[in-house]
């Protein structure tokens, strides 16, 4: 079983092979997702909402992410493991270096940061020091209070151009992957076509190189609000591993995301 690396994902992109990602927070679920063939696992700060019961991701700490990264690492043999850098853990280059090191030592293969031009120095610094970076644009949940809620981004021409420009700049700074969240499908397609690095979408249409969902949404166990872009695969399959397999297959076949999961 060959391990998935950022180079593997670049090959998938060049071959037009769609890949899948899921969040994971413990060894058992991570092992199930990994063994079924999920390519990327994210220890996401989404744990603040789906595990800890908060209304947003802001209370999550580096220690929280590091603990769950160690747990997930023990269940993973094949998938690329990304750890989220939580709110205010990368506000300065010095903080970024210290906290990214902690997450890599916990078992991550890559760290993920949210933001655009202001992050370029930190992305370059991490990359030059051997820490791979996944960038995140569009609806960045750590900025929810700036946005005034969980709202679609990039619908007007100026913001769409800004997001595209930031995507190109982050790639130039050394980012190896990019997540785009809750942006119009045409913008996500333009970004995917403009970059050589793989682009992973969530609520961003079917034209990105890969798709990511929160595991609780895929399994229909989220409490409260269910995002429009998600799909409950457990409901249609009745078994966790079958649900994961259905998600992988539908992404590979271009069935998911469908129009009802996409923003115009």
From Swiss-Prot:
This is 3-methyl-2-oxobutanoate hydroxymethyltransferase. It is an enzyme of class 2 (transferase). It is found in: Cytoplasm. Belongs to the PanB family. Binds 1 Mg(2+) ion per subunit. Disulfide bonds: none annotated. GO terms for molecular function: 3-methyl-2-oxobutanoate hydroxymethyltransferase activity; magnesium ion binding. The keyword Transferase applies.
């Amino acid at each position: 079983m060959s391990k998935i690396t950022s180079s593997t994902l670049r090959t998938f992109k060049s071959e037009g092979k769609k890949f899948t990602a899921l969040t994971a927070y413990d060894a058992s679920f991570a092992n199930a997702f990994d063994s079924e063939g999920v390519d990327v696992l994210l220890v996401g700060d989404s744990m603040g909402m789906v595990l800890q019961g908060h209304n947003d991701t802001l209370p999550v700490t580096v220690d929280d992410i590091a603990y769950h990264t160690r747990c997930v690492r023990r269940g993973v043999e094949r998938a690329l493991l990304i750890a989220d850098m939580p709110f205010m853990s990368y506000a300065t280059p010095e903080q970024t270096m210290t906290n990214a090191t902690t997450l890599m030592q916990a078992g991550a293969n890559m760290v993920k940061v949210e933001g655009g031009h202001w992050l370029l120095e930190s992305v370059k610094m991490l990359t030059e020091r051997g820490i791979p970076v996944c960038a995140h644009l569009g609806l960045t949940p750590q900025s929810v209070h700036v946005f005034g809620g969980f709202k679609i981004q990039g619908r007007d021409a100026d913001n769409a151009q800004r997001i595209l420009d930031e995507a190109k700049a982050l790639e130039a700074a050394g980012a190896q992957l990019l997540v785009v969240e809750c942006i119009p499908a045409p913008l996500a397609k333009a970004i995917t076509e403009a970059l050589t690095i793989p682009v992973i979408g969530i609520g961003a249409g079917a034209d990105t190189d890969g798709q990511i969902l929160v595991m609780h949404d895929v399994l229909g166990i989220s409490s409260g609000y269910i995002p429009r872009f998600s799909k409950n695969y457990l409901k249609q399959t009745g078994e966790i591993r079958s649900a994961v397999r259905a998600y992988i297959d539908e992404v590979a076949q271009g069935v998911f995301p469908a129009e009802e999961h996409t923003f115009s």
